[in-house]
């Protein structure tokens, strides 16, 4: 049986042992923390006592360990070959370090380089419109675009450095993305250290089945699903990534095409989901500051 590096990282400490079969020279140049060095021949001839723990077998590239793990499974052990071996694990660690550096750079840029154009306008909206209060649990709704990803980082920084204690949930609704788009959203969230919760819907299928105003239907359904999921997760607010330009554009469209003056407002109490509120913390940020 095989186990991926991601699956290994999710195992509870104390429920598994990592056994490194590589040679002494290779191990001297680096090993997985906490692993035990046991050469292949010794491992097969005199395996450790079967305590019920999972055995994660590691070789250089995850090839030799496949046969060894299968042999141990045949003897009653719960053994797994680590996919990619030590090289795969090392590459994963390097990617993590790179992601941490990118995330740190993004956070620093928001508070330093873009302090006036982004951070100050963000905190201005939060204070002026009282968007976040003590004890709030805010579902930050992420579509995967630049605006919602920026909002996620801004809300994280507000939680970290602000004076008002509140909780965050980062919510991604999959309305029917293809695999490539879904993966890109997950990868970007991981790089930015945004712990997303993804839930799936069939909105695209429903919207594509109607001829009249599919965009309007899609938007309405999105909002309803987000409210519903956020409430299910114990949130009392959802945050959307609309910025100043969105507000102006929506107002003008309403005037020119619907003959009505109806603007986006920074916060809105839901009429269909009791106790829920929608907030727009990027209300004062201009789009050219984001681009």
Language-model-derived ranges and their functions:
Residues 20-21, 58, 82, 141, ...:
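Active-site-adjacent beta-strand anchor residues
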């Amino acid at each position: 049986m095989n186990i991926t590096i991601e699956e290994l990282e999710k195992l509870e400490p104390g429920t598994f042992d990592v056994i490194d079969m590589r040679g002494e020279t290779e191990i001297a140049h680096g090993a997985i923390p906490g692993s035990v060095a046991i050469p292949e021949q010794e491992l097969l001839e005199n395996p450790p006592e079967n305590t019920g723990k999972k055995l994660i077998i590691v070789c250089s590239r995850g090839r030799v360990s496949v046969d060894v793990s299968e042999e141990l499974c045949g003897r009653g052990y719960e053994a797994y070959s680590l996919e990619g071996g030590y090289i795969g694990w090392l590459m994963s660690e390097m990617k993590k370090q790179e992601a941490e550096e990118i995330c740190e750079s993004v956070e620093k840029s928001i508070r330093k380089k873009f302090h006036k154009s982004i951070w100050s306008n963000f905190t201005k909206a939060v204070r002026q419109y009282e968007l976040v209060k003590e004890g709030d649990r805010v579902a930050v709704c992420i579509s995967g675009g630049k605006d919602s990803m920026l909002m996620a980082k801004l809300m994280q920084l507000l939680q970290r450095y602000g004076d008002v204690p509140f909780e965050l949930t980062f919510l991604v609704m999959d309305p029917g993305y293809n695999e490539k788009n879904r993966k890109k959203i997950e990868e970007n969230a991981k790089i930015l250290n945004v712990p997303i919760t993804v839930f799936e819907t069939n909105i695209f299928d429903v919207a594509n089945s109607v001829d009249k105003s599919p965009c309007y239907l899609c938007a309405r359904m999105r909002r309803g699903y987000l409210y519903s999921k956020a409430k299910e997760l114990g949130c009392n607010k959802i945050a959307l990534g609309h910025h100043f330009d969105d507000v102006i554009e929506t107002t003008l469209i309403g005037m020119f095409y619907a003959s009505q003056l109806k603007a986006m407002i920074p916060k809105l109490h839901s009429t269909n989901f009791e106790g829920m509120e929608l907030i727009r913390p990027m209300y004062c940020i201009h789009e050219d500051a984001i681009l």
